[in-house]
A protein has these predicted regions:
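Phosphate/oxyanion-binding active-site loops and adjacent basic polyanion-contact surfaces
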Residues: 1, 72, 100-104
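Active-site periphery "cap/insert" segments of enzyme catalytic domains
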Residues: 1-41, 59, 63, 71
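Generic amphipathic alpha-helical segments used as scaffolds and interaction surfaces in large
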Residues: 9, 13, 70, 74, ...
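A structural signal for short, well-ordered beta-strand segments and their strand-loop junctions
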Residues: 12-16, 51, 94, 129
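Short, solvent-exposed loop/turn segments at secondary-structure junctions
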Residues: 19-21, 55-57, 98-100, 135
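SIR2/sirtuin-family catalytic core signature
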Residues: 29-30, 38-45, 80-93, 98-169
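A charged nuclease-like catalytic/ligand-binding cleft shared by nucleic-acid processing domains
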Residues: 46-72
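Active-site glycine-rich loop that binds ribose-phosphate moieties when present
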Residues: 66-83, 110
Length: 169
């Protein structure tokens, strides 16, 4: 399935993975490692890889420990400010994350805090969560779902559930 992904025309990648899979699949993309690099760089939102939990190539960038995660959380508003344009202007597909993942929830909460209801609605077709199931006979489903954020705001997203990512690609 990963070979299908590398043939797709995508705008960019946001990942928490430390490995170099994204760079190997899309060598023409510019990687930004860690929140610091992303926050303080001039990005164009196209042809870029955002490695928000760091990279094994730069051990100081890794988000590993509880203290690292606390520091990551403190910087979420800055990260959200950088990502908000991407989320509004481009579809964002979340692979390998649960909608309930605490890191994703924190980032989305920071983004929602910057938007009024009208702009939150503009995100409804751009946030797509793909959930994998181990059931080989599962027929892919696509549904709209509201995520209740901590501030009691509903964030509309699209949820795809599948056993085979090939169908999604």
């Amino acid at each position: 399935e990963i070979h299908i992904l590398e043939k797709l025309s995508i705008d960019g990648i946001i990942t928490t993975n430390w490995d170099d899979t994204a760079e190997r699949l899309f060598p023409q993309f510019t990687p930004y490692i860690g929140q610091e690099q992303l926050i303080f760089s001039s990005t164009y939102s196209v042809g870029e890889i955002y490695k928000i939990h760091g990279s094994y190539r730069d051990p100081k960038s890794l988000v590993l420990t509880e203290d690292d995660y606390d520091d990551f959380s403190k910087k979420n508003p800055y990260l959200a400010a950088k990502l908000i344009t991407i989320f509004i202007e481009h579809p964002v597909v979340f692979l390998g994350y649960s909608i309930s993942d605490s890191n994703i929830q924190e980032i989305l909460q920071s983004i929602v805090a910057c938007l009024d209801n009208a702009n939150i609605q503009k995100l409804q077709d751009n946030l797509i969560f793909v959930e994998w199931t181990s059931d080989e006979d599962y027929a892919m489903t696509i549904e709209r779902q509201d995520i209740m954020m901590a501030n009691k705001v509903n964030l509309p997203v699209i949820k795809i559930k599948t056993h085979c990512f090939k169908e999604v690609y």
